[in-house]
Amino acid sequence: MPSYSIIENFEVHKNNRFLEIAEALKPELLHKEIKAEKEIMVEKDRQMRTVITEEHPIENLYAKSLKRDDTVFVDFGDHAVGYVTLELSKTGSHQDAPVYFYLKFGERLEEMTDKTADYDGWLSRGWIQEEYIHVDVLPAKVKLPRRYSFRYMELRVIDTSAKFQLKINGISCDTVSAVDMESVKPVDFGDPLLNQIDLVSRKTLKECMQDVFEDGPKRDRRMWLGDLRLQARANYYTFKNYDLAKRCMYIFAGLLFNEGKLSACVFTEPEMEPDDTYLLDYALFFSSVLLDYYEATGDLETLRDLYDVAIDQIRIAMTQLNEKNVVEDLGDAFWCFLDWGDGLNKQAGATAVLIYCIRYGIRLAKILDKQEDISWLEEKQAMLKEAAVKEFWDEELGMFVSGPDRQASWATQIWMILARVFDKETNCKLIHHVMEVNPRIRMVTPYMYHHYIDALIRCDEKELALEEMKRYWGEMIRDGADTFWELYNPYNREESPYGSSMVNSYCHAWSCTPTYFLRKFYMDNEK
């Protein structure tokens, strides 16, 4: 089902002081030129998986003369985000017609064999990374103005003429990021797979750290509040770019809309502008983002500046309770995220997120000695916990249920555990019961798996959390991930919430958090 929001009578309330602070923190991006490494041949195998059948030094490609319908594939050796340049010339007689060719860029190998003409998803096909280019005069240096996120490139010659052929003399990419991989010291966790998971996590985060924390450099190329929360946590244990996190918080806080609500995401070009999308859980997470930042930096001035915005999101959410003192169920409308799970009911999970974020609000209020807010928040927290158990706990199932159909899902249980509705001992029993029962509505995104790992650790199941991390993110690596993906279902690698995996993001911010867990909770394993 398409998930988007259009808010009628949408009004943006800008705080120019906040936006000026954010602009002053805009990073100067780091540039590094990399060159194509190999020419490869790709095809589908018997299992219909894309495989490399041959690979040659890139000089092999540069020695070729290409004519109509010739297709070549290039491997840059690792994921890259940046601007591609092709150095072209010709062989044969004088160029008597434009050379016309097609380019496609892919974050994973499968994109090289995707038939883009067959795309039938509900997101814009404009997200597919392809170009049709005419070059009137050769030799030429063709610099693509659009930033691409990729490892692999296809070039197909649509036409030259009978008198000349196209020659490629060089392919390079001017990569960009706010941070440098070399600035983070590698850690040996005593397990090669964990070391690789940590590396790929950091690579994923680095590629998404641009002018802001982007959700994905291929798609959506903008800033989502739920992603920011996880990216910032990983950043504090790796690149430690505190200014970028501060910048992003001030952007969100400087672009409130109706009733003081925070937008779920912000567009960064041509100027900062909030999307007319409100997600209850994402807005509430601002309290978590703010406290995480304060604990990492001790920046009390920023906490004072942004405190009211964080607490207001809790006040707004409290107006969305029903007569039973739990969050009103808005059904299939795009009102709360939690996960992309098909059919996932979000009422109980949203209530749990509210309880969870009130705990962060209380901690913020205590730092600033806001006694009235502390009393109000503690009262509402107790009320919500009592209501959540009364409305959602099913004694017979031994799990929380959600919505009119009393649905039991992984997401609901995990968020109730993180909300600490029960004590730790009961939560530990619950998480093991969920693993044994394995509710039909499963987790499908690394975003939800992050919260699963978090819940395990909070239940003192650190070793189990480590094994689950290795199982999920490790399997992604075995499936070819250079950077971690937006969505990963080991049982259906082509699953997509958008109707086609062609527009899935294969370098996605919310999947970068294994490095956060490893470096925060497992550094004692360092050799």
Each language-model region and where it sits:
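Extracellular/oxidizing-compartment recognition motifs
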Residues: 1-215, 243, 248, 264-268, ...
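Active-site core of glycosidic bond-cleaving carbohydrate-active enzymes
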Residues: 224-239, 243-527
